[in-house]
C-alpha cells in the first residue's frame, strides 16, 4: 500500500508548515520562561540579591545582544556556583539565557564596573520584556 503521488506534496507541505510553527514559538516560550523566572527572582527578599557582579550592561556600544546575554550567564554561573542561595532559579535562568547567547564571550573583571545581582536581574527583565513584545 503506497502513497499516491498526489498525497506526497501535501505531506511535505504539512511537515514544513509544522516545523516553522514550532520554531517560531520557541522564542516566545523561552522568553516567557525567562521573564517568569526574573519576576520571581526580583520580588524575592534575599541577601544574595546584594552580591556584587560585573556590570554586563556597561559594555562597549558595539557589543551584541547575544554577547550581553553570554556575559550575564557568566555572572549568574559565578554566583550560583559559589553561593547556595537561589541556585534553582539562577541555574534555570542561566540555561535559558545560554540558548539566546553567543557561544563565547569574556567578562574582564579588572576593567568592568560592578553592580548588584538585583540590578543585573532587573536589567535583564527590562531587555527580555522588550524583546518579548517584538517576538
Curated annotation (Swiss-Prot):
GO biological process terms held by the UniProt record: B cell activation; immune response; interleukin-4-mediated signaling pathway; negative regulation of inflammatory response; positive regulation of DNA-templated transcription; positive regulation of macroautophagy; regulation of immune response
Q: Which Gene3D superfamilies match?
A: 1.20.1250.10
Q: Which GO terms describe its molecular function?
A: cytokine activity; growth factor activity; interleukin-4 receptor binding
The UniProt keywords, alphabetically, are:
B-cell activation, Cytokine, Disulfide bond, Glycoprotein, Growth factor, Secreted, Signal
Signal sequence annotation: 1-24
Among its keywords, does the record have Signal?
yes
Name where it mostly resides.
secreted
Carbohydrate-modified residues are 62
Q: Which Pfam families match?
A: IL4 (PF00727)
Q: Which SMART domains match?
A: IL4_13
Residue pairs linked by disulfide bridges in the UniProt entry:
27-135, 48-85, 70-105
Compartments in which it is found: Secreted
GO cellular component annotations of the record? extracellular space
UniProt keyword Ion transport, yes or no: no
Q: Which InterPro entries match?
A: 4_helix_cytokine-like_core (IPR009079), IL-4 (IPR002354), IL-4/IL-13 (IPR001325), IL-4/IL-13_CS (IPR018096)
Q: Family per UniProt? A: Belongs to the IL-4/IL-13 family.
Q: What does this protein do?
A: Participates in at least several B-cell activation processes as well as of other cell types. It is a costimulator of DNA-synthesis. It induces the expression of class II MHC molecules on resting B-cells. It enhances both secretion and cell surface expression of IgE and IgG1. It also regulates the expression of the low affinity Fc receptor for IgE (CD23) on both lymphocytes and monocytes. Positively regulates IL31RA expression in macrophages. Stimulates autophagy in dendritic cells by interfering with mTORC1 signaling and through the induction of RUFY4.
Name this polypeptide is given? Interleukin-4
Q: Which organism is it from?
A: Boselaphus tragocamelus (Nilgai)
Q: What is the name of the gene encoding this protein? A: IL4
Amino acid at each position: 500500500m503506497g502513497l499516491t503521488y498526489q498525497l506526497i506534496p501535501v505531506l511535505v507541505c504539512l511537515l514544513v508548515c509544522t516545523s516553522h510553527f514550532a520554531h517560531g514559538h520557541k522564542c516566545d516560550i523561552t522568553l516567557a520562561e525567562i521573564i517568569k523566572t526574573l519576576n520571581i527572582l526580583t520580588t524575592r527578599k534575599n541577601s544574595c540579591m546584594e552580591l556584587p557582579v560585573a556590570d554586563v550592561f556597561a559594555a562597549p556600544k558595539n557589543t551584541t545582544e547575544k554577547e550581553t546575554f553570554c556575559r550575564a550567564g557568566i555572572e549568574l554561573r559565578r554566583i550560583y556556583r559559589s553561593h547556595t542561595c537561589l541556585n534553582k532559579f539562577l541555574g534555570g535562568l542561566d540555561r535559558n539565557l545560554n540558548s539566546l547567547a553567543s557561544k563565547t564571550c569574556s567578562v574582564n573583571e579588572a576593567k568592568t564596573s560592578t553592580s548588584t545581582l538585583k540590578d543585573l536581574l532587573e536589567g535583564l527583565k527590562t531587555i527580555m520584556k522588550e524583546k518579548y513584545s517584538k517576538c
